[in-house]
A protein has these predicted regions:
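…primarily DNA-binding HTH/wHTH and HhH modules…
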Residues: 1-6, 10, 95-138
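Glycine/alanine-rich phosphate-binding loops at beta-alpha junctions
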Residues: 1-45
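Terminal helix-turn-helix DNA-binding modules in bacterial transcription factors
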Residues: 13-20, 26, 30, 49-85, ...
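Basic/polar phosphate-binding segments, predominantly the helix-turn-helix DNA-binding elements
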Residues: 26-59, 82-104
Length: 138
């Protein structure tokens, strides 16, 4: 990779593709690091520095963002959606959804409103972090 901003975008693209295709086994720090050709510790440190959250937390929020869309836009059962996005039970999904969005999935389905998705990488100063490049905008 020429610079880290391209690498982080590539990682996000891989994450989204894997979630859409339900290939969660590819969503490990080891697999993502190998795809980017960086060490696991480097990817973990830089991801946290750029996003303000661990890769694990980002993956959880990203799964919830996809699940939120399905709750709103499909008639699939909440259990089907929960299982699709890696939750062990309807209850675990409901707890995570409520913690992230302040409302249960069933209440959100009845009255969908705008919610804050915690999956946008915050702006950063690439020179301050010592990684070069021009930022997240490509």
């Amino acid at each position: 990779m020429e610079n880290w901003s391209q690498s982080i975008q590539q990682m996000i693209d891989i994450i989204d593709r894997c979630i859409r295709q339900q290939e969660d086994e590819a969503l490990t720090l080891r697999a993502l690091s190998a795809a980017l050709r960086y060490s696991e510790s480097y990817v973990s440190r830089k991801f946290r520095a750029l996003s303000g959250m661990s890769l694990r937390d980002y993956l959880r929020f990203r799964h919830l963002a996809f699940a939120l869309r399905d709750v709103r836009d499909t008639s699939d059962s909440l259990l089907e959606i929960a299982v699709r996005y890696g939750f062990s039970s309807h209850e675990a999904f409901t707890r995570a959804f409520r913690a992230a969005y302040g409302v249960t999935p069933s209440a959100y389905r009845l009255h969908p409103t705008a919610v804050v998705l915690h999956t946008i990488l915050k702006p950063f100063d690439c020179y301050l972090l010592g990684i070069g490049g021009t930022g997240m905008a490509a």
